[in-house]
Amino acid sequence: MIYPIVAYGDPVLKKVAQDIEKGSLDVVKMSADMFETMENAHGVGLAAPQVALNLRMFVIDTSVFDDEKITPVRKTFINPVIEEEWGDEWPYEEGCLSIPGVRADVYRPANLRIRYFDTDWKEHVEEFDGMTARVIQHEYDHIEGVLFVDHLSSIKKRLLKGKLTNISKGDCDASYRMKFPIKK
């Protein structure tokens, strides 16, 4: 099932998401639906709050990057906790399915260690670096109620204010179905 993607301005995007209790929902189906939604929108990651679910879960697929230095990773992260981030912060022009048409440089540490459960409720602790770490950090921010634009300087935020307001009203171009917080 392809979910509509929640647009900038929806309160669910600014909430700290809730842990998922084992057995409380079908995480295998939810993961499959989130991957289908992400792929339909040509994304590399999608967090549950972006499909209006206030839950600590996200999916990533870095195989879409055409770069031999990036090891493809396709995973579901349930109740993740970033235990440590380290390394030099580096900029990359990020975008977000909830904020179509807006991109900006965000600085993030190069490495991380994360603890999470998979869809079989097996616990993992793994380290990631480079672009995969960045995608995880971006999606993790979503379950913490943080958007990539929150990392920008106040000047850049002011410059984007009109565009962000328009997105919240549905005045944007997206090739996928979206849910807008403010009706036109």
UniProtKB/Swiss-Prot annotation:
Binds 1 Fe(2+) ion. Its cofactor is Fe(2+). Fe cation binds at residues 96, 138, 142. Its EC number is 3.5.1.88. It comes from the Bacteria. One of its GO terms (biological process) is translation. One of its GO terms (molecular function) is peptide deformylase activity. The keyword Protein biosynthesis applies. The active site is at residue 139. InterPro entries: Peptide_deformylase, Peptide_deformylase_sf. Keywords: Hydrolase, Iron, Metal-binding, Protein biosynthesis. It catalyses: N-terminal N-formyl-L-methionyl-[peptide] + H2O = N-terminal L-methionyl-[peptide] + formate. Removes the formyl group from the N-terminal Met of newly synthesized proteins. Requires at least a dipeptide for an efficient rate of reaction. N-terminal L-methionine is a prerequisite for activity but the enzyme has broad specificity at other positions. PANTHER family: PEPTIDE DEFORMYLASE. Belongs to the polypeptide deformylase family. This is Peptide deformylase. It comes from Cytophaga hutchinsonii (strain ATCC 33406 / DSM 1761 / CIP 103989 / NBRC 15051 / NCIMB 9469 / D465).
